[in-house]
Every structure is written in structure tokens, then in C-alpha cells.
């Protein structure tokens, strides 16, 4: 997904804990404690370990995942949190390594200089040996393990009685384990943003925003590097923390090194309604230029992304949740290459049982489907899992 879209559109669905889960959300437990230790065990079946268009390899997967979350208010104005999770996946039919270790670590520091002047810094590090979502169109049964380190910073300060300014920064590093994927996709993405909002009403803010993005590839950057400038306007709405709606619309000016530049529309709209305890509906739509998994044939992808997520308690102890994302896109061909249209759908459903505050039992199913004009980019993947999480 385009880093600008990820940064300012999808943060509302990013989990603060690094414990990996299915596409559908899992209800939070043990809220309000400074230190939480969790151990998750799972048994799953994956129908397409490497996301291959043909010759898929399936396997049972046995998982043990310990993790720890620590949160502390250092002073009345300073908050610090840290987390780490280790995930051990054992496969019965995977070629090569059958025991994979994945790591997730995060560190967050937030400080309020005053009631309305706030600095928020967050760093997230991940080594994903068994990625949740797989790339389409890579070589058959390639190991898609990758490392990502992402730093986010945000500084908010009042500019006038009803005007607030915000400076945002993100830097994300991607490194792939497979040598071919590494040559094609290793990169660093840097994003800067400046925004000003005006309080039209206590619950409504009008927003104007500028963003600048640089994408630098480690190999053959002279053919793949990009620079983008975004200008957009929109509004944010919040009512008693139960209903939040946010929208931006504007233009992106993208300069491609070694290829033609482009001007494209940019839009992001999202909303969340928390209608009861442990119950919410979350949705959004975004349109942008995004990076592609096939950098040899395509510059980038012009994508429309829509998603909806629902969590609802069936009883005091049973919660059902589901998530659907739809992404029709057009891959922008390099000189001499035709454009390719494709649609990606990801769906997940989870049923959770919380017998005590320290136990969570869940069963989930996730479906991935990519239909492309280019047959090598088609993808079918189904995963079933049952898991238990114990908190201490």
C-alpha cells in the first residue's frame, strides 16, 4: 500500500500490540495494566504457503508465540510503552526451513508540553518469516520473508485560538530475505507532512495538508526511485469518541526516475462507530499510486482500496469479528509494457471466546484472492486456525 495512504489513513486499524492475528480483529484483554505477558498457541492450515499462482504448497502450521507489553506514565505528561513478541512456526510440508522465527518489537514515547502541544514518537521493528499477506506475481514458491523497520513522528502545536498545526514524519526500511526479491524490492520510504486544521465546530475540523514522499530502492534505483508531492483538503469529525469520520481529497504529483512522471488523484476516507462495549464497525476507502511487487515491468499501481471491519459481542463471553478488503487496481506498465488490471480481495472471520479475563480462545478463517489479466499474478490462499492465548 502507498506509504502516504498507510501513514495517515490506516493508522486507525493498526494494533498497538505486536502479537500477530488473523485479518479479523481480536478483542483486547487486560487493559489498564502496566505489564502484560501473553503466550499464544495455534494450530493452522495454509493452502498456499508462498502465494504461488500454480503449484501451490500447502501445510499444517503449529505456532507458539510469547510476547510482552509494557506501558508506563513516566510523569503526568510523559508516556512510554514497549513491546516484543516472538513467533515460532513449525511446518510439516514446507521446503527448506521447517521452523521459522518471527520477531516484532515496538517502542513509543509521547510527551505533552501543554494540553495542546504534543510530541509522539513510535518505532516498530519486524522480522516476518511467515508473512500474513503475500505478494502476487513473484517467482514460483519464493520465500517472501522480510525485515521492516518503521519510525513515525508527530508534533502537534496550536497556531491560533481555533487553528492547530501538525508536522508528521515517517521512515520505513524494507529488506527481503530472498535474493531476487531483495534486488527488486529492498528500499527505504521517507514521508514528510504538514497540516493545519481549523475548528469549525467543537466536533468538526477543516483540514489542509501537504505531504512529500521519497522512495529510494537499494538496487537499480536509477530506474525505480520516485518522488511525490501531495496537496489535499478535507475534514475530521468526532462525536463523543463513539463516532469518528475523516476524509482527504487532492492531487499527487509523482516524478519517476527513468520513466514518465504522472499526476493522479488522491483520496482517503475512513470512519469508525463504537456502538457498544467491544462492538464497533470500521470502514474506509482510499485511492492512490502504490508500489508494485513487479518493479521490472511496472512503475507502480493505481489502486482503489476499500475495507470494512466489524466486531460484535454475541454474548458476554463470545465475540464475532470480520473484515473484508477490496482492491481493484491497474498496474502502470513501463515503456513498452502494457498496463495490467487486477483485483485483490482479502476476507477474514474470527470467533472469540473469553472465559476469563486472562484467557482467549479463537477460531478463524482467512481467504486471499487475486484475479489479474496476467495469469502469473493470480493468487488463491485459504487459512484456517484455532488458537488459545493466556495472559499473565
Regions found by a protein language model. Name each.
Residues 1-29:
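Cleavable N-terminal export/targeting peptides
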Residues 22-392:
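Gram-negative and organellar
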